[in-house]
């Protein structure tokens, strides 16, 4: 077993992992052990692993998903949550694209980067952290669960409240 800490939307989270893959996937978010106890703790619970097992995922990847679920369950108590969506920063504001898997979130990120170049930074390609700050603002943070597009920014970006649900594949076909 390995213990390490990550930054989970500004909160220290202690991770207990059996598989080296988990630490590798969390590497960009790893922090030094905090002076005070971790606010969040996560390890792979056998019940969660059984629920997520579909026969195709490796035990190491199942552990990574279990840790995701464990953190996701604890975050709301701290005014934070993980959201399924792709997040970019553009001119200092975060934009979040939400939709079911396979409907074009990654494509939207790629197109924004293609047409707007260096003004666009990928915050997270699959499951960013969101936090509600004491002043009422929402911030978007990267997370280790980045999907197909690697996160570039690991700092928080103020959201502009412009979450967009991407069009379904059928709608995209009709417009081509």
Segments predicted by a language model, with ranges:
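Conserved lysine of the Walker
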Residues: 105
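A noncatalytic interaction/capping subdomain that flanks phosphate/NTP-handling catalytic cores
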Residues: 1-101, 111-123, 129-176
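Hydrophobic positions on the alpha1 helix immediately C-terminal to the Walker A/P-loop
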Residues: 108
């Amino acid at each position: 077993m390995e213990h390490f800490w990550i930054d989970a939307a500004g909160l220290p989270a202690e991770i207990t992992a059996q598989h080296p893959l988990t630490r590798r996937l969390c590497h960009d978010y790893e922090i030094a052990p905090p002076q005070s106890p971790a606010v969040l703790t996560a390890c792979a619970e056998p019940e969660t692993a059984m629920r997520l097992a579909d026969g195709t995922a490796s035990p190491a990847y199942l552990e990574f998903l279990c840790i995701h679920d464990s953190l996701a369950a604890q975050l709301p108590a701290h005014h934070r949550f993980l959201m399924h969506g792709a997040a970019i920063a553009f001119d200092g504001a975060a934009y979040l694209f939400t939709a079911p898997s396979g409907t074009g979130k990654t494509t939207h990120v790629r197109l924004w980067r293609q047409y707007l170049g260096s003004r666009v930074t990928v915050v997270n390609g699959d499951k960013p952290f969101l936090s509600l700050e004491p002043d009422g603002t929402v911030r978007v943070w990267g997370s280790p669960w980045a999907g197909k597009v690697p996160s570039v920014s690991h700092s928080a970006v103020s959201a502009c409240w412009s979450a967009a649900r991407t069009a379904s594949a059928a709608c995209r076909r009709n417009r081509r």
